[in-house]
A protein has these predicted regions:
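Tandem repeat scaffolds
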Residues: 19-175, 179-199, 206-207
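TPR/TPR-like alpha-solenoid helical repeat scaffolds
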Residues: 128, 203-219
Length: 219
């Protein structure tokens, strides 16, 4: 059986008889389905390159390892969808809802994305993300995730990127200092922590600053 027909059969057997199933037929037959309801659809490894999915409802859809290169996903609802390992090279995600979206290991090279749209998604390990698309807060939070997993070099790198994006965030300096301390680099850890203390003094938080200085004195 040809691969496209096999994919269509697999998808339809797993879908209820509903508008969603009709939309799956349209999508897999025509390669496009703007404004379609495709919530919870199973589209693992589907080839949807250049598909028009403008304003499609793809909530919780499983698009892991799908090919969406050049796809029009403007204003699509991708909340809590699975795009892990998907190829989204050159896709248009402007206006797309990405809250809770799993973009880990996805390729976003050349993708068009609104600034801040990735803040509530899971993008760690994604490729091709333009530097300005990740806010200082999202970089810091990703660093916290890596630190909680005990991956200190990765945590240090992400906290460093958060600092580059916003050098006035004292907590990112603290976090990078702690990450460096966990790796045995006490000299650099002390530098980061003392810089954080200086920032906190200037920002009107002397108690926090004093606590950090006391910590450094014990290193």
């Amino acid at each position: 059986m040809p691969a496209p027909l096999l994919l269509l059969l697999t998808v339809l057997l797993g879908a209820p008889l509903s508008t969603r199933a009709d939309n799956l037929i349209v999508l897999l037959d025509a390669g496009s389905c703007p404004n379609c309801t495709l919530a919870d659809a199973d589209l693992v490894c589907a080839d949807l390159s250049d598909a028009n999915l403008n304003a499609a409802d793809l909530r919780r859809a499983n698009l892991s390892r799908a090919r969406l290169d050049g796809a029009d996903l403007r204003n699509a609802d991708l909340r809590f969808s699975n795009l892990k390992g998907a190829s989204l090279r050159g896709s248009d995600l402007r206006g797309a809802w990405l809250d809770g979206t799993d973009l880990r290991q996805a390729d976003l090279s050349g993708a068009l994305i609104n600034p801040g749209a990735l803040d509530r998604s899971h993008w760690l390990g994604a490729m091709g993300i333009n530097q300005g698309l990740r806010s200082p807060a999202s970089l810091h939070n990703a660093g916290v995730d890596e630190a909680n997993a005990g991956r200190w070099p990765q945590a240090e790198r992400l906290f460093g990127e958060a600092i580059q994006a916003d050098p006035e965030q004292a907590m990112s300096w603290v976090a990078r200092g702690l990450s460096r301390g966990q790796q045995g680099d006490e000299a650099k850890a002390a530098q980061d922590l003392l810089h954080a203390a200086d920032l906190l003094d200037r920002q009107g938080a002397p108690k926090q600053s004093d606590h950090i200085r006391q910590t450094v004195a014990k290193l």
